[in-house]
From Swiss-Prot:
Gene Ontology MF terms: DNA binding; DNA-directed RNA polymerase activity; zinc ion binding
UniProt keyword annotation of Chloroplast present: yes
Subunit structure: In plastids the minimal PEP RNA polymerase catalytic core is composed of four subunits: alpha, beta, beta', and beta''. When a (nuclear-encoded) sigma factor is associated with the core the holoenzyme is formed, which can initiate transcription.
The gene coding this protein: rpoC2
Protein name: DNA-directed RNA polymerase subunit beta''
This protein's record includes keyword Lyase: no
GO CC aspect terms: chloroplast; DNA-directed RNA polymerase complex; mitochondrion
Signal peptide region: none
Job of this protein: DNA-dependent RNA polymerase catalyzes the transcription of DNA into RNA using the four ribonucleoside triphosphates as substrates.
Species this chain originates from: Acorus calamus
Amino acid sequence: MEVLMAERADLVYHNKAIDGTAMKRLISRLIDHFGMAYTSHILDQVKTLGFRQATATSISLGIDDLLTIPSKGWLVQDAEQQSFILEKHHSYGNVHAVEKLRQSIEIWYATSEYLRQEMNPNFRMTDPSNPVHIMSFSGARGNASQVHQLVGMRGLMSDPQGQMIDLPIQSNLREGLSLTEYIISCYGARKGVVDTAVRTSDAGYLTRRLVEVVQHIVVRRTDCGTIRGISVQPRNGMTERMFFQTLIGRVLADDVYIGLRCIAARNQDIGIGLVNRFITFRAQPVYIRTPFTCRSTSWICQLCYGRSPTHGDLVELGEAVGIIAGQSIGEPGTQLTLRTFHTGGVFTGGTAEHVRAPSNGKIKFNEELVHPTRTRHGHPAFLCSIDLYVTVEGRDIIHNVNIPPKSLILVQNDQYVESEQVIAEIRAGTSTFNFKERVQKHIYSESAGEMHWSTDVYHAPEYTYGNVHLLPKTSHLWILSGGPYRSSIVSSSLHKDQDQTNAHSFSVERRYISDLSMTNGRVRHKLFSSDLSGKRGDRILDYSRPDQIISKGHWNFIYPSILHENSDFLAKRRKNRFIIPFQYDQEGEKELIPHSGISIEIPINGMLRRNSILAYFDDTRYRRSSSGITKYGTVEIDSIVKKEDFIEYRGTKEFSSKYQMKVDRFFFIPEEVHILPGSSSIMVRNNSLIGVDTRITLNIRSRVGGLVRVERKKKNIELKIVSGDIHFPGETDKISRHSGILIPPGTEKKNSKESKTKLKNWIYVQRITPTKKKYFVLVRPVATYEIADGINLATLFPQDLLQERDNVQLRVVNYILYGNGKPIRGISHTSIQLVRTCLVLNWDQEQNGSIEGVRASFVEVRANDLIRDFIRIELCKSAILYTGKRKDIAGSGLIHDNVSDRTNINPVYLKDKIPSFIQHQGTVGTLLNRNKECQSLILLSSSNCFRIGPFNGSKYHNVPKESIKEDPIIPIRDSLGLLGTTVPKIANFFYLSYHVITHNHILLTKYLLRDHLKQAFQVLRYCLMDENRRIYNPDPCSNIIFNAFDLNWRFLHHDYSEETSTILSLGQFVCENVCLFKHGPQIKSGQVIIVHVDSFVIRAAKPYLATPGATVHGHYGEILYGGDTLITFIYEKSRSGDITQGLPKVEQVLEVRSIDSISTNLEKRVEGWNEHITKILGIPWGFLIGAELTIAQSRISLVNKIQKVYRSQGVQIHNKHIEIIVRQITSKVLVSEDGMSNVFSPGELIGLLRAERTGRALEEAICYRAILLGITRASLNTQSFISEASFQETARVLAKAALRGRVDWLKGLKENVVLGAMIPVGTGFKALVHRSRKPNNIHLEIKKNNLFEGQVGDDILFYHRELFGSCGPNNFHDTSEQSFMKFHDS
């Protein structure tokens, strides 16, 4: 009592309110100072005091006590204003959807956080004794987050997938929620409930596995005598708190010196005082003992464990520390689950630190060190790659601000900034423990229309023929409006593409086509057109070969784009290009025109790049009907493709798989192949010989005889029949040594009878080994093909095609369609084309460096009786016209009076009356659609366009005159003028001219569109000029013509003055809100389609911004419908750092599997360490040291990983617990096959210490390597089969144990519990064992007592015998803990 009085005199008197955290601190100090029992008395008094006070106060809680925060109104209003501005920018096309989502979430998150911080001061000022305030902030009930939901705002919620819903709940629970908010909050609540349930079960299972691994670990003895330890020193990254946590309660493994003075001795445990001393004296690294270094195999000693966390004293002997460790790690899992629900998965770590200006002034920095970029909200900013010094010049003072690298500078050089204005944003450090995950976000089209983009787009390599494009730089995607009309029945229409029509002129009969079949991805169109006599010829022909046009009657000219009377027409659609096959029927002249005909191949949008194939021709000589393999022998293959041509450009062909032949011969090895479903029964055996017409399955018979090879694939069976001679090799046979080679004729072939014969033909030798010992050689016949360059090209392609014009060359190239050694599979009854002769388009890159591609289109021109067909190929600067002249034998005067009875390639089918046509005039345009069976046509009605103008009294000055050069005059058919009046015929001539348009960079007000400010974009436009020099644009780029509709144009009259006006060019895209004229901003965004002297017409369009790396779906000029996917963004976001990551992450580390690419794969690292050290040190030492080092390394990194997860959640777990578990999963080694010792079999898992001891005892190297077991595997590899069987796989474990005759020594807890025996733990256990043993051993001398006891105890419990000299009476801990008290540091 006197002691207490004396101490009480020293105590400091505190007078302040105490909350939850202070209470925790107080209790821990009390336990340290007075011990457990005394503290519990004190706490009892605190409890009674608390209840007495609460009774007197009688706190109650009513709804009026929930005071809302006064500043909430304008905060919410401000956030709404910001998100409204954001919405506007999105509709102008300045930010894209992902940036918008990100920014709106951050706006609301910041608002909600600000309100949460306001909450406490608000209560303190207005009503400090408010019950809600007292309860939550004292830590009695409720936390800040819950109170915030009651009186602040509920904020952002997440949907069941864990994604944020970007509509925040603005009300709090006191005000009540609107209907929408109620539904959203139900989402969040449901996620919380589901999460809690799932995580609780997960945490429970984790605990079960952990306990299973370490259940047998008990403190068995005082000291194992190890001299090793791990070093701890306060590194720069380690906070003082972490240093404290690591050291307190451990035992020193070595003396600690400062200079020559020893301040702490070995085997002394560390208290707070000692740690403070280490910190103040800056001691050298402190070596501590950990469970890792304990030398006991299957238990642990007192000193390696250290203090027990429960009572702050050295752990007692017999305590089951393993189970405590397992539960300490598993249990927080359940708490963590509940924690997720409160944060609701809000974007954490999304807000970055800001640098603010220190005072008003001008800001200056070196502009060469920064480069422009976009922030993640889409704002323009500068990125600095190194440290940047920024000076702010005020009136009387100059401030220097240092900005770290990788930061974003949000102001411009020489800009005036105000004090506290944000001038830079520092990237949030990546050290925070949150994963980045890559998320895809799809953007859908809001309206129907036609797609355009204003930059180059590359194909993603894996979708070479698909319609997935990658954007290389920031640009806009435009959806040009137009009402699409989809027709599912293909029919003919009398109107050509780009005709202007009147709604009532459509008199199309309904004609249904019976057979619209799809074969091999090709669509057959059967077209009918009018007979001379007016009858309908409705014949349906069967096509024998898909590449052929069957032409009857007397039409002899090639007409690729127009079909005439009675001719049936078949277009092959290959992914995204159409191929028009055609052939001549020459009756008069006998020309060498092969039967198969030439196919001209032009992509849908008509753009061809360099090395594109313009036309090809399949020679029948290289056609095979059977499957087989092509070989080029020793021929060198030269790929004609340079690297730059690998990028396929908007659907033209690419040649990565096509090879050009250097040598003019290749070989084809025939074989018969049947691909059968996996379930079918085969009637022949593998490697058996069959004759011709043998039955293979129930309904298939072989066409050739030979050897049968059966190969089973995943879903089907591949059965080959290989014809050829079987040849059993003799000793001296040369052929048999090789396999898979071609042998030329003239080689001597030895038979087994030693008679020599010379080969007549090429043969192919293949070695077949049915069993391991036997093998034979199959000699297979080979078909040899010579590729003749001698095909007279003039007969294939018209001669004037092959002359060079304007740097465009056309080369004839033969391609082999299949790679060397590739097996070719023919589908039943189709022929395989081996070689294709192609016409390849090329031009000089040097002279025309800017030319991206050429445009190909078909043109038809009629003059008197001569019909000319052109394939027009234009570079951006010139037109090359190819005519195929064919005389029209039957005078064509009758037919061609009305031009419109020719049908187009992609015909239009219209219903009897389409509502949109009846209302007003429209324009028909056809486009090939993605959908193969449907044609699309787009109707532009006046509602899609609006007109701006007229401008009075201005000269037309925005067409660069010099770019218009007149080409040779080309007769073009009569056509309606643009405004519906017929243009005066000046001998029927138009001037056809080209006008290269550079896209003015899209005019934007605020946002910087990086990447394409300076690059001009060249689009080929045709401007037709009549004699008044007006310019019209029939824009063949899109297959749509925009004509004058009836006059519901919007006339927006503006005084058009040259100074303020922007020069408009045809086809230019104009964004919304851009000032074109003095009178105010543009009302809608769109594309300029018609420019008049006094006005212009804009076709409405919606811009979508896309950043580099985004994927664009669909093709340039394709018709899209509302709701189609336009763009897919891939962006990184930090996952919310709640336990949704925590628990699985811990589990993943403990089970040693890498679910996630982010977590470094520990197993690989472990194997790497193993190999290197073994290589350096040689065999016996290498294994010993290698395994040791590996295990030490991996243990430390595992502990750090697990701690990281828990710390990020704010859960404190002592390292000891984790170490015990990690020790168990890393303590095994795998015996390798290198040294076959007679003790362990290779592949056996044994303890590391046992391996080392056995190695010492045998004096022979055992080769082993360290291995990481997961906790499940570790539980199934213990010394007790009873505990394994009670964990998992009971039958398997028991059966194995019975077969091996395993003995269970019942050393752990679980085995004893299962058998109902007494468990070998508990602090009284040691005394019990010794009492039962003492009577037998009385005659021994008493002074040896200690040594004897320790040894007997070991012997009974464990079959490992180990003598330690340190167990004698001279041990530091020879008596009980009292002698130790002098080192106890209170």
